[in-house]
Amino acid sequence: MALAPAAGQRRQDMAQDSEIARGDGTARSARTFTGAGQRGTRPGRLWGWIESRTGIRALAYAVPEHANTIWYILGGITFMAILISVASGVWIAQYYNPDPAAARESVLFIQNEALLGDVMRGIHIWSAYIAVIGAVLHMVRVFITASYKAPREVNWLVGVGLLGLIMFGAFFTGTVLRWDQEAYEAMVHNMELASLLGAFGGFFSDAFTTSVSMLPRLYIAHVSIVPLLLVFLLIAHIFLIKYHGISPTPAQEEAGEAPGGKLPKERQTASYATHARKMLGYGLVVLGLAGTLAVLLPGAIGAAPDPAMEITKPSPIYYWMYTPEAWFGVNGVLYAAIVFFGLLVLVPFLDRTPLRRLRRRPLMLGLGGVLVVALTVLTIITAVTPVVSHLE
Ligand code: HEM
């Protein structure tokens, strides 16, 4: 008996909190989010119970209107693609064997015999592509709206780390696990690059230990080290987004409406609940898209690796590095990565004016343009040229 009024009071307090957070006192979206409109009905009572026990209403905090447009949900869509990739990865890991003598056979087992193996493997591969493409599009949005400017420079750097991690940690190690010809060549590249890095590359080289071969070590990286780092960086990214709030639009900032790079409370008239709902909706679209692609374009499994040959190109995601490799040898991969990621790291420190519209930031307009043209041209050259032998 004594607990009931306390829970009711807590609910009332939380409702007031979300009204205060909205600044305009209407709490319209908070009510929609919590389903309070249907109080008295069975689903309404169930939802009320969930709210009071979990505090989910706290998600209905105020955000600027533009935060709920697709451009500002691209990061959330990338997040959903990562979640789908993790869930499908857990499924196929039940059937994968990282022993080099059995790895490729186990991938064939996943594709042809395991329960839902082909669909889950396809969803895993395609959601990984969607995550990389989503992260790049999200970064382009942040770049165009100059959201990396003070006070969000550190979050831009965390983002660069996330991009590197999903492209070279998750995606790359995943490619090697297939243990066909392309996978094997990717791993040999990994080892040659490690030797170029000297002491820094030790961990990624074959010589690090004689007790476990490279494939099981890359598997451990793929299923534990990389996901742990990803969780750590995502927590930092999300903390900083919450701490600084979503950046104002370039027009709002240049009109002086956002002192300190943040819209005042009374201008934040939308709800994060809407953002979260849209994110879940787009997440279902990503799942549907990955599932459809899994059926229409199942992930290929090449011939068993032959160490004497070099016959494949990497995944299209790395095409921009393959052409520099043809020009400079394996060093070319390193040069391409250093130039690309080095420029990304420099962005917030090169562009320090308060101007936010892209057309008023000629240096960034030029840098962005040069990068897009260079990446496109390098990718096209790789696509139209025959395979070249790069390895010693
Ligand atoms: C794994 C990849 C990533 C995930 C899951 C992710 C997630 C998010 C989410 C959910 C937001 C909130 C708003 C939005 O969606 O735009 C955001 C904001 C932000 N992200 Fe990312 N992000 C990723 C990669 C990146 C990259 C590659 C960069 C840049 C190099 C970056 C820089 C930023 C910045 C500066 C903000 C604040 C933007 C603002 O306040 O307008 N993120 N991110």
Regions inferred by a protein language model and the residue ranges of each:
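Membrane-embedded alpha-helical bundles that constitute the cytochrome b-like, heme-associated redox core
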Residues: 2-327, 332-392
